[in-house]
Amino acid sequence: MYVVNGQKIYIGSHHGADRYWTIAVTDPKGKRHQNVSWFMIDASLPGITTQPLYMLSAQSEGETDEHGHKNIIFFDNVRVPADCLVGGENNGWKVASTHLEVEHSGQGNIRTNPVWTALLAHCRTQHRDGRPLIEDPDVRAKLAEIFSRLEAVRLLSTRNFWMVYAGEKRSYEGSQVSYLRKTTNLWLTKAIIELLGPAALTNDPVLGAIDGMAEAQQRRGIVEQHPGGTTDIQRVVIARRLGVGAREPQQAGRLGEEGMARKTAQPVEA
């Protein structure tokens, strides 16, 4: 039996889940990456509180899609059976690393970006100075650049998806796609403004463009810099996997004990 305390923010996107994948510190004095354990905790256990978190990328308050709605989970002396431990005590980082590799395009999210599809249709049907936008050489050049960047991310995601299901060992590939997707999404916000002007900054049904998707991308491009590790973290992972990172292990930045909101799991007798 373990007693879990603490909280976690930005939890999603499957709202109303029956189980929570949870990583918690099980050896406070242990070395980094060797002091945490992974649990699959029953969401109905006493002491668990879930609060919705509506983010900048939400279309409106109360939205429940994966982009705009996450959760904050609180654990208050939650008694967790030992058989909820996954991978053995203090092996949580190994389990988490596998989970992150799946998150970094191993889950099969390889469709064409819907923002691109809507943007292309808009430029084909909307007119400026009496002719379709797509007939403007500058517009065509920008569309070509947008497609090339988004397609590069999609193809690399497809490669990673294949590697997972072919049983191929991956190294830097997961973080590579995560880094490119984040930086491309942020770049896309500016590219859309260059194409659509002020219409890209409002979701007004009359003044906005592509059914509000352009404005939503402005917010989503910022929010998507965080999940699964920031761009700086992805670059560190890539460097380490390629063997060009720091030669000596470096201590990660830490908050003061009063500012820490980490989860801890203390073993107790059932």
Regions found by a protein language model. Give the residues of each.
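Alpha-helical interface subdomain recognition
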Residues: 1, 72, 101-270
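FAD-binding core of flavoproteins
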Residues: 1-121, 128, 244-270
